[in-house]
Amino acid sequence: MKSGLWYFFLFCLRIKVLTGEINGSANYEMFIFHNGGVQILCKYPDIVQQFKMQLLKGGQILCDLTKTKGSGNTVSIKSLKFCHSQLSNNSVSFFLYNLDHSHANYYFCNLSIFDPPPFKVTLTGGYLHIYESQLCCQLKFWLPIGCAAFVVVCILGCILICWLTKKKYSSSVHDPNGEYMFMRAVNTAKKSRLTDVTL
């Protein structure tokens, strides 16, 4: 009976770890779309005073931010690589712009806590999927079709105009009710047969 309770306890603990209820990794949304780009939100505990936060794309370091507290209440923030970041009381926001489908990857927030001790490293992350712009794809598909349809309509219009012009010209030439009637040429050199007949 005791072993059954022990297994049940381990099973519940495993479920809590997998769902992220213990470390809080599943309690917030990491990616927020912001002004045509993506804001990646990396959270840290409120009690942390000195830390290093790295934004990783796969295994590559994109951004590196270090917060240290010197003498007094001054705070110095070092950003080693070029990246736009924003620090708040319990999170660091990294901003990425001009992304396309090639930037889709796993992004991780690597937090190294220096103060308060003990030294601790946590890694949270998620997959950022970037869709190709739907308008761009639709234009790529419909632009050649639209151009081909325009050319076909122009050609058919020219053929129709030529046919109507020819039909109008040919019908006016043979119009029996027209102002001028075309007569057949008469050969005056022939003599009539009635002149030889006497009454």
UniProtKB/Swiss-Prot annotation:
Record: disease: Immunodeficiency, common variable, 1: A primary immunodeficiency characterized by antibody deficiency, hypogammaglobulinemia, recurrent bacterial infections and an inability to mount an antibody response to antigen. The defect results from a failure of B-cell differentiation and impaired secretion of immunoglobulins; the numbers of circulating B-cells is usually in the normal range, but can be low.
Membrane-spanning residues: 141-161
Quaternary structure and partners: Homodimer; disulfide-linked. Interacts with ICOSLG. Interacts with PIK3R1. Interacts with TBK1; this interaction is critical for the maturation of T follicular regulatory cells.
Domain Ig-like V-type: 30-132
GO annotation terms (biological process): cell-cell adhesion; immune response; T cell costimulation; T cell tolerance induction; T follicular helper cell differentiation
Induction: By phorbol myristate acetate (PMA) and ionomycin. Up-regulated early on T-cells and continues to be expressed into the later phases of T-cell activation.
InterPro entries: ICOS (IPR039943), Ig-like_fold (IPR013783), Ig_V-set (IPR013106)
Tissues expressing the protein: Activated T-cells. Highly expressed on tonsillar T-cells, which are closely associated with B-cells in the apical light zone of germinal centers, the site of terminal B-cell maturation. Expressed at lower levels in thymus, lung, lymph node and peripheral blood leukocytes. Expressed in the medulla of fetal and newborn thymus.
Membrane side Cytoplasmic: residue ranges: 162-199
GO molecular function, one term: signaling receptor activity
GO cellular component terms listed in the entry, alphabetical order: extracellular region; plasma membrane
Function, as annotated: Stimulatory receptor expressed in activated or antigen-experienced T-cells that plays an important role in the immune response. Upon binding to its ligand ICOSL expressed on antigen presenting cells (APCs), delivers costimulatory signals that enhances all basic T-cell responses to a foreign antigen, namely proliferation, secretion of lymphokines including IL10, up-regulation of molecules that mediate cell-cell interaction, and effective help for antibody secretion by B-cells.
Top-rank taxon: Eukaryota
Residues with glycosylation annotation: 89, 110
Keywords, alphabetical: Cell membrane, Disulfide bond, Glycoprotein, Immunoglobulin domain, Membrane, Secreted, Signal, Transmembrane, Transmembrane helix
Signal peptide start and end residues: 1-20
Official protein name in the record: Inducible T-cell costimulator
Mod. after translation: N-glycosylated.
Entry-linked Pfam families: V-set_2
Disulfide bonds: 42-109, 63-83
Gene that encodes it: ICOS
Stretches in topological domain Extracellular: 21-140
